């Protein structure tokens, strides 16, 4: 009886030892592990390939300058911004066509200009009578492509060149005055007594309200532009004997 029990126990142990092992306990290098490795590598390769194909569908990120320019070109401005008189400046004009430089030229049509009262002010320049001369010679010009300027705080800001209003593109013009020549006469400013005074002509600036970019929105800011040509004089050193 005891021998029969021992025989059954040994047979049972041999059967358990000969049973196939699970994949979790398979040693490295066995066929099961190789199949898992190949499958894993194949999935990884397909994932990388899919990632590359996905990247090709999306363009590379744009530069900061390109993003700023693109956003500035696509911004639509609310017409209500132009209804407040405190934002209007006689030297800033929004128009679909170049404005005239003098009253002798053809006026800008009211339908093509947002600043209708500004055009009239620009035409009221004083006309000198014959025999009258300016101390300095100046030149007036409409600046149409001003992209940057210095604001009243001394910071460089982005100026909106084109403005989209009700699906109409208006250009922002600045009426600037500059000196034609720092020395209109050999001695400096015209009409200054060169025996006692040194003189020269220089361009001066003032601040006007202009439409600028602040992030992705349009905003009014005071910016500096050239507005006059003045004479600067200084007394000459006199030797007293």
Curated annotation (Swiss-Prot):
It holds the Pfam family NGF. Residues 19-122 form a propeptide. Residues 47-69 are annotated as: Disordered. Glycans are attached at residue 145. GO terms for biological process: cell surface receptor protein tyrosine kinase signaling pathway; modulation of chemical synaptic transmission; negative regulation of neuron apoptotic process; nerve development; nerve growth factor signaling pathway; neuron projection morphogenesis. Residues 47-65 have a biased composition (Basic and acidic residues). One of its GO terms (cellular component) is extracellular space. Residues 1-18 form the signal peptide. InterPro entries: Cystine-knot_cytokine, Nerve_growth_factor-like, Nerve_growth_factor-rel, Nerve_growth_factor_bsu, Nerve_growth_factor_CS, Venom_nerve_growth_factor. It comes from the Eukaryota. Disulfide bonds join 136-201, 179-229, 189-231. PANTHER family: BETA-NERVE GROWTH FACTOR (PTHR11589:SF10), NERVE GROWTH FACTOR NGF -RELATED (PTHR11589). This is Venom nerve growth factor. The lineage of its organism: Eukaryota, Metazoa, Chordata, Craniata, Vertebrata. The gene is NGF.
């Amino acid at each position: 009886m005891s021998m029969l029990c021992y025989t059954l126990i040994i047979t049972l142990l041999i059967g358990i030892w000969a049973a196939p092992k699970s994949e979790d306990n398979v040693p490295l290098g066995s066929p099961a592990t190789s199949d898992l490795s190949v499958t894993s590598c194949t999935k990884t390769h397909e994932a990388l390939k899919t990632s590359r194909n996905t990247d090709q569908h999306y363009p590379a990120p744009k530069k900061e300058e390109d993003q700023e320019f693109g956003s500035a070109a696509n911004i639509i401005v609310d017409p209500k911004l132009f209804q407040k008189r405190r934002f209007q400046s006689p030297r800033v004009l929004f128009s679909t066509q170049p404005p005239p430089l003098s009253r002798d030229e053809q006026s800008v049509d009211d339908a093509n200009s947002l600043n209708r009262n500004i055009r009239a002010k620009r035409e009221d320049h004083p006309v000198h009578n014959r025999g009258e001369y300016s101390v300095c010679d100046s030149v007036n010009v409409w600046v149409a492509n001003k992209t940057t300027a210095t604001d009243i705080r001394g910071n460089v800001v982005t100026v909106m060149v084109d403005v989209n209003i009700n699906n109409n593109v208006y250009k922002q013009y600045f009426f600037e005055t500059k000196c034609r020549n720092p020395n209109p006469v050999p001695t400096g400013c015209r009409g200054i007594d060169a025996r006692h005074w040194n003189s020269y002509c220089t361009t001066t600036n003032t601040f006007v309200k202009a439409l600028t970019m602040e992030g992705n929105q349009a905003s009014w800011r005071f910016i500096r532009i050239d507005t006059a040509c003045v004479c600067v004089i200084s007394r000459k050193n006199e030797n007293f004997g």
